Amino acid sequence: MPSEAPESLVQALAQILHEHDSLVAGDKVLDGSRILTLLTPCLQVVTRLFEQLFPRGPGTGFQALPAHPADSVPILRAQFMLDMLQKTPSLKLVHPAECPRQFDVNIFPFKSLRSLELRCLPPHCLRGLRSVYSQLEVLICYRCVSSLEEVISLCGGDLSSALPWLELHTLDFSYNTLKDLDSSLELLNSLKISDLSHNQITECGSYLKVLSELQYLNLGYNYLTAVPELSIGTTAKLHSLILRHNQLSSTCGLEHLPNLQHLDLSYNLLLEHSKLSSLTRLHNLKQLFLEGNPFFFQKDYRALTAQHLSPKAFDKLLLDGSLLSGSEIMNAQMFGEKVRLQPSSSATESSCTGDLTDSYSAAEKSAPRLLRKKSRVKVRTASISERSDSEYEQRGQPVVLQHQRDIERTDSFREQFGVDWLQYRSHLESELDPDYVNSSHTSPPRASPSPTNPNTDLKHTSPSPAPECPRPPSPKTSVITPDNELMEKVEEGLEEHLWGLQEAKKTSEEEGLIGEALCSPVVVCPVLNGQPRNPDWPWVFLRITHHFLLEMDPERGRILLKRELHSLRGIQKSSAPWNCNGEEQELPLLTLSFESVCEEKQTVNYVVLDNSPESSVTILLDLLHPMLERNLREKAESQDDLTRMQCLKCKTEFRHEVDRGDICNPESIQQRKDPTAKGLHRNHTGDASCPSCGSLHIILATLNSIGEVSTPLRPVSTEPPQDNYVGGGQATTSFYLSDEEDSSEADSSPNTAPSEAERTVFYSFDTEGQDQQLAMDTGRSSLTGSYKYTALSQSGILPQDGWQISPGTTQTLDFRLVDHRLKLYIDMEVLDGDMEEFRCCMKVPVVCFGKALEFWALVAVSNQKIYFLEITGEIRGNPGDWLQPAESQSLTLLTHLHVGLQEQSLHLGFDSCGGAYTLLTRNQHHCRVFTKQILEILSELPARYHSNLQQSSEESITPHHRLWPFIHDKLGMAESNSPPEFLYVLLFFLREDVVSPNADSSCVNTDSQLPLVNTASPAALTQGARAASPVSLLITRTHMYLLEEDHQWLPDTRTNELPDNMQMKEKQPISNISSVHLIKSASLHLRIHLYNETQQNESAWLLWTEDPEKPREIVEWLREPWEAEYHIHFNPVIHDT
């Protein structure tokens, strides 16, 4: 709650809205280009003040304050504020977490409201919605709604019955706790866009049918098991449907959406491609997402998917983000031909050929077999005809016409069988068999299997599954011709051959499984909800093998269903009343629990109907109990290894209770359906939360005390490590997001970098103020991985390809990019302000005024402060182990932002209560980009905070400058205050007194001692700068200077007599240069060989820069004065390595 008086708060708001230079300027708010965002305590103070100023209470329509002295500035600003609120079209209300939930907020001043967004504000706390609901066009509620009725029908805290919302076209109720829809949607006649994602909706019912104008519907991240029902008007207008992360096992219902263009079914329970048969009618489909479904991991996933799509959508369809290739379309057509060539079995055959996986059972629905093209009504001519008729037909068949018919028949044959038509040439050349033709005329056409009633023909058939999406038959009438007869003959031959092979293979597999049975068949009745699962044929044989539980057809001995016993999670024996031949009996009931993604397959009940049911149950239990104990033991061992978690906020380590371990418990199933036990801020995606603080930011636990990880280790590679960095260093461990299937494993091998198929996730902040997640991926297109450990070798600072902290070795320089581990640490441990958001960060050596030495620091910038986090050790493991918060300064106190000499550093100065800092970037491009991003962040602040900022993009040289004595040309013909040209570079230096005869020898002087401070980057360390010391290189037209500076800096407004902070380390005339050496493999390194004729000694300057362009720039600076001295070409020596 703000501590200011209501009047002062209103004055401050009015001043903010009146400043046109501010990002929240009044004109931008009024024209709708900006959204007015207010905290609920602030709005409460403002509305209560206005209520006091209206003695008779607020009325309807636009209002003005009662008459007051015209020269009263507070009253004028209050009137301005009231006018602004009455004309504001877009409002966003944010309810802070520390405020009580019983907190009334009135929006009566907003008379022209068109868009309203509520964040974390309970609807019952909102007043005044009934006066504006009829004109609202956009309504957004985030983490505050538990039912639609309390907002749409009751108008929040007004508790009044609402009429239709006439103008509302966009409704966003995502990230809430909605469990069901209700009839309040009937009031949204004009709704076009609806986002109900990230809720707990299990069923939509028929409530969405009233939305006849709906064009976009997002129901992702819910618990839907079926496609929602829509009205006829909606089916014609809907173009985008998002159903990702649900529990859909079928697409039935999508065939009624002919104009659908964008469809997202990712991460559902679609087990087979046949479930996509409803997509064949979506001719306008442009984008389809199916990743994460069980069939997504099949080898020919894209081709099998394409065969169920409309051919009209092939050219323009994006499947999982990429266009279908020509080969995939061709493979899809080939798969389609194979499906059409498979014969249709009779009802008797289909009843015994259930799916041999645990995905389907005999009583479950399955997709119908595709109809053959030849299944059509045959219209025959009369078998007895007049002689004159036949003679006339024969006379009307000239030779030319017969030849033409042969050609057409050949072309039709080639079109039917494609490139393989020559294999069936014998069928084309052979004469048609008259007996076969006659028999084919009298035989009925084949049809797809259909449900049969076993009571009518119990001896020949058993129940068969009903088709999932029945379609009305549309027979095509055509006259039988010899061409059609030939096609039918060839097709029937192929069908018989293919069907025979499949039947033989299936029979052999079933015989192998039955031969492994551990017990005799037991007669049981599968029960579902207290009733037989298949009332027409209730009993089956139950058999157990080493790996499967088999349900078999008692008539023909065929396998109807099989379940894998390694997923068995529970056994329960009880009794159930059963009616046998009119007598009520108590029979044993065996309940088995399995681990499955489909809820209906998690539990199966069998009533034992054997002659001796008790002994049969005992035999089954004796076989199943050892298997159950083995499964539970393996599960416990895997949980011990894989589920030890750590909270990034409170550092608590705990073991995560995996949902699948509780599948056998009905309470756990109900708890999974209702994950709101811990409030509105629950993660709806199923992630775990910390039991201590409730935080969702958890990771796999780090290394334990003996150096082992909590996950199984891969075997250490026997290949020698490939370390690209000079020097030793212990292997350190970091974790990142991986796409590999074995993502829970840990890599204990040192010096192992992530493979190309793996990725690290970064977070960045865009200019609009929204968090974006950027995946730097070189292998795959989707993020489906998990946390994973890997080891990297380093020295001093972790190589940039391990943690990706800018500036690094990535292709693009963007200080907004930050590793996801570091982003979590900064959000949890560093940022402490209200509504404070991360913006950018930079790893850079920093010099703080008053401290002698520079140190590695992570400079993190938020929308409120700048944090200087000292890097105290190797970058690995928990960021809290190698990051120490040093100092922080408010952005509102920043008074000076100056770029150092020749963009080698950046100076930040704060007011009298703050400090002064120098960022030694040693790179012009890094300094320029980071300065630009700081200025962008400062532009978000109100104008009064950055209007007094003193900024300079270049450091000027005056006679009082510290470098003036070195760069001033005393031999110049005229005195001038403008200095001559010079080159100034911050780099790392190492001297060699004796030059090795081999110019390619190592750059490191083994006799040199490691300096106390070495802030060289990993790239410079790799190229030999480990023993170098930081210096400043100054090159004039005659000399080269090596200067030691402490880089202490104070703003001009606080200039004092600073002690001498610079001394000359060495000076060499350019004429002493004997040669200059560049190395292609070390772009940051430069060797300058020197020879002093007076002292007759040789030496070398070994230089390392942080900018790969600087070595060549130094060479070009030395070229002109050296050639002017010796009048010969100055050619550097370039080495490969």
Curated annotation (Swiss-Prot):
The keyword 4Fe-4S does not apply. It comes from the Eukaryota. InterPro entries: Leu-rich_rpt, LIP1_N, LRR_dom_sf. One of its GO terms (cellular component) is cytoplasm. Residues 464-475 have a biased composition (Pro residues). Residues 341-367, 379-403, 433-481, 665-684, 711-731 are annotated as: Disordered. LRR repeats lie at residues 112-133, 135-155, 167-188, 190-211, 213-234, 237-258, 259-280, 284-305. Its main location: cytoplasm. Residues 342-360 have a biased composition (Polar residues). GO terms for biological process: protein localization. The keyword Coiled coil does not apply. It is found in: Cytoplasm. Pfam families: LIP1, PH_S11IP. Keywords: Cytoplasm, Leucine-rich repeat, Repeat. SUPFAM superfamilies: Outer arm dynein light chain 1 (SSF52075). Belongs to the STK11IP family. PANTHER family: NISCHARIN RELATED, SERINE_THREONINE-PROTEIN KINASE 11-INTERACTING PROTEIN. This is Serine/threonine-protein kinase 11-interacting protein.
